[in-house]
Regions:
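Ankyrin repeat (ANK) tandem alpha-helical domains that serve as protein-protein interaction scaffolds
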Residues: 2-321
Length: 321
């Protein structure tokens, strides 16, 4: 993945200053703790422990619980009482909800080390994880205050969370992007506003359009499918493939739309084969009502063997990964 970059003199001074500020803030927090527990802590946490556990702790994410554990010695006891394994407390960049918690993550991340999945913890990775907070103000902070680099994964994650304003910000500021992956993500997750923005902005290739349309059909995103049929005017060949993808996953609403509104040619017996093999009964009944041709016994057996082989290969690849 690459060697850890050596920090310049200016960068070292900046890191030193950040740590000094963090230490100063920690000392201030310690002084406040010397004043003793607040009325809120005593009243709610100490005297109404079960209410606090069921209505407060249960709402905290992993990172929130980690910060809570550092409040005082009682907080760890309370987490144990609530059933959390305090030896496995941790944090994630994507769960930071404010500039202050993100600043803490910036200071405490193991720069240059690898995550459990092998991803290098560099500036671009940090930026992409900030996107997962779904907060534009945090992305702006990490870019404009921390001058953090970004790469195609920033926009890939933007199209996972579906934040249009964040997407506009990325393009306005020259963020790299992967045309096919970003369009596929927006289609898969049903983010029509993001998908329309991408198609208007980057003018993707026909291959990308085909891939995104088929992804929408397979994932049951009817509004996205309508966009490709009614606004993008996809070809009959793509409509036919979208119909097959809808049947493959049992999306009856998408299948009906492709047949009744998109007027996709209903002349491929593979539709019946797919519905039979994957036991999508409603799709099967509908296809037969609409006069879809039936496969011969030999055709069905051949396709069933092909589907089975594909499943085995997919499962084998999943185990390897």
């Amino acid at each position: 993945m690459g060697k850890k970059k050596k920090l310049s003199g200016a960068a070292k001074r900046k890191k030193k200053k950040e740590k000094e500020e963090a230490i100063a803030e920690a000392k201030a927090d310690l002084e406040r703790l010397k004043l003793g527990p607040t009325k809120l802590w005593t009243g709610l946490v100490t005297h109404h422990r079960d209410i606090f556990v069921s209505h407060v702790l249960s709402k905290l994410n992993k990172t929130d619980r980690m910060f809570f554990s550092k409040a005082n010695t009682e907080s760890l006891d309370l987490l144990e009482y609530a059933g959390f394994n305090v030896s496995k407390l941790g944090w994630s960049i994507c769960q930071c909800t404010s500039v202050s918690t993100l600043e803490w993550a910036w200071i405490n991340i193991d720069w240059g080390e690898k995550c459990d999945d092998g991803t290098l913890q560099d500036y671009a990775h940090f930026c992409s994880q900030v996107v997962r907070t779904n907060k534009l103000e945090l992305l702006k902070w990490v870019r404009e205050v921390k001058k953090c680099e970004w790469d195609k994964w920033t926009i890939n994650f933007v199209t996972h969370v579906g934040n249009l304003e964040m997407l506009k910000y990325c393009f306005a500021n020259g963020c790299p992007y992967d045309e096919q992956e970003s369009c596929r993500n927006a289609a898969r997750n049903g983010y029509l506003d993001c998908l329309r923005f991408l198609f208007n902005k980057i003018k993707p290739s026909r291959e990308t359009e085909k891939d995104a349309a088929e992804t929408a059909a397979q994932d049951g995103q009817l509004d996205i499918l309508k966009y490709f049929v009614e606004e993008r005017k996809i070809s009959d060949a793509i409509k036919t493939e979208c119909m097959l993808r809808s049947v493959f996953k049992g999306h009856l609403d998408c299948l009906k739309y492709m047949v009744e509104e998109a007027k996709a040619p209903l002349n491929d017996s593979q539709n019946i084969s797919l519905a039979r093999y994957y036991e999508h009964t409603e799709c099967l009944h509908y296809l037969r009502e609409k006069g879809c041709p039936e496969p011969t016994d030999e055709e069905y057996t051949d396709l069933a063997n092909l589907y089975s082989a594909n499943e085995e290969q997919h499962n084998s690849e999943s185990e390897d990964n």
